[in-house]
């Protein structure tokens, strides 16, 4: 038993009906002891079966020839139904005690199955299992057929899966009390898959959690940032939409209007006059608010402005309330004399200024246009988008201006550097010319400015380098004492020349 590998140990335990867990160095000895106990229990059960079957074995002798004939018929039909029989035998429980044939029948039937029994005996001995001699080749024959179809089914089959019937043959159908194949293996009939799942779960638990924690933090940060941006955008929309118009507030203000009851002073007259004036102002307020809202939301009525002319407003009020023009003028007079904001502006010839008297009123405009929620949202969204675009345009303009300034500064630096390089070249040319003159290699001690330019700048670059050359000439005239600019007549023409001035070796104090 000590020489069994882990796979063989697992198969032995599964064959005896025990489902082992992971086999490691610490659990291997435990499973070996378990296998030893299970084998001992199996031997005890086999001995009990031998003692119990000793009596019924004598009664089963006369049925030996019939059993031989039935087995011969089944062997002839076995090739035709080999595949279905294998699938049936996988789930069929082993019989507890098959009816043994008579001694004479067993000796006669040992011929066809003698080789199989002899080959199966060493396997049973290596497994540590003992089978009674009277049990016949039925269980072993079933084992051989099932092993021929699948090696894995042999490992998971247990020798103690027997039906409670004592005289049931091995080819008889299983009884209702037989235990299924999956019940013997436990909840998980595939130990290899269970072990692989356990191993993967252990590997997942040992995986470092730093990356997952960082992912969770980043996802939460993005979520809160998105919610913050959404709330900010909704707040901007709400601010741009403004508060909805409140006609009830205007109506409450209108209830404070004085009533024109000059001729009639009774309470009924005053109540009627007050109700009529409130109705007129309420209708006027609604009319102006709707017209102003339509003008702001697409202007479907093609209005010139949201300031409605007085005559048009008066005609509308007369059609709706059937009130005379005097009452309309009285309402305008009260609006002008009231210090409260009723939501109606009275404008004169200049739309930017409010009228002070009824005669100067040209048009009426609502201070709180009545717009739908869709129009308010679209206007707020348009305003927000416009402001954002203006901001980005300003930002782009400033960015472009900065890029332009940086480009300009870089060009100036490059031009200044080129000017210094040109000054160095001019000094070298003039100094070399003076040295050549001292060595009688040149006729004159000076050299023409244009001659120096033509020798330093190629023709195709003179237009591009003109600014650099002019700055170099100015720099030499104002900052270089070793080069003097003079005017000489050369070849009959006056020409500006440069002369190299050699500094004296001694100062006046040394002399």
Curated annotation (Swiss-Prot):
Every copy of the LEM domain together lies at 2-42
For the region Required for nuclear retention and interaction with LMNA isoform C, give the residue spans: 80-141
Return the GO cellular component terms, semicolon-separated: chromatin; endoplasmic reticulum; nuclear inner membrane; nuclear membrane; spindle
Q: What is known of its domains?
A: The LEM domain is required for inner nuclear membrane (INM) localization and contains a BANF1 conserved binding motif which allows localization to chromatin. In late anaphase, as the reforming nuclear envelope (NE) surrounds the chromatin disk, both the LEM domain and the disordered regions are necessary for localization to the NE core. The disordered regions, also named low complexity domain, confer the ability to phase separate. In late anaphase, as the reforming nuclear envelope (NE) surrounds the chromatin disks, both the LEM domain and the disordered regions are necessary for localization to the NE core. During NE reformation, the proline-arginine-rich sequence within the disordered region binds microtubules, targeting LEM2 condensation to spindle microtubules traversing the nascent NE.
Q: Where is the segment annotated Winged-Helix (WH)?
A: 403-511
Q: What is this protein called?
A: LEM domain-containing protein 2
Mark out the compositionally biased spans (Basic and acidic residues).
38-80
Consult the record and explain the modifications the protein receives after translation: Phosphorylated; strongly phosphorylated in mitosis compared to G1/S.
Question: What is the protein's known function?
Answer: Nuclear lamina-associated inner nuclear membrane protein that is involved in nuclear structure organization and maintenance of nuclear envelope (NE) integrity and NE reformation after mitosis. Plays a role as transmembrane adapter for the endosomal sorting complexes required for transport (ESCRT), and is thereby involved in ESCRT-mediated NE reformation. Promotes ESCRT-mediated NE closure by recruiting CHMP7 and downstream ESCRT-III proteins IST1/CHMP8 and CHMP2A to the reforming NE during anaphase.
Taxonomic lineage of this organism?
A: Eukaryota, Metazoa, Chordata, Craniata, Vertebrata
Sorted alphabetically, the Gene Ontology BP terms of this entry are:
heart formation; negative regulation of MAPK cascade; negative regulation of phosphatidylinositol 3-kinase/protein kinase B signal transduction; neurogenesis; nuclear envelope organization; protein localization to chromatin; skeletal muscle cell differentiation
Annotated region (Interaction with lamin A/C complexes) at 80-112
Q: Which positions bear Phosphoserine? A: 505, 507, 509
Q: Quote the tissue specificity entry.
A: Ubiquitously expressed, including liver, brain, heart, skeletal muscle, lung, testis, spleen, kidney and white adipose tissue.
Effect seen on changing residue 13 to R: Reduced Lemd2 protein levels. Disorganization of heterochromatin associated with the nuclear envelope in cardiomyocytes. Increased DNA double-strand breaks in the heart
Q: Which domain of life is it from?
A: Eukaryota
User: Where does the record place Low complexity bias?
Assistant: 81-94, 172-183
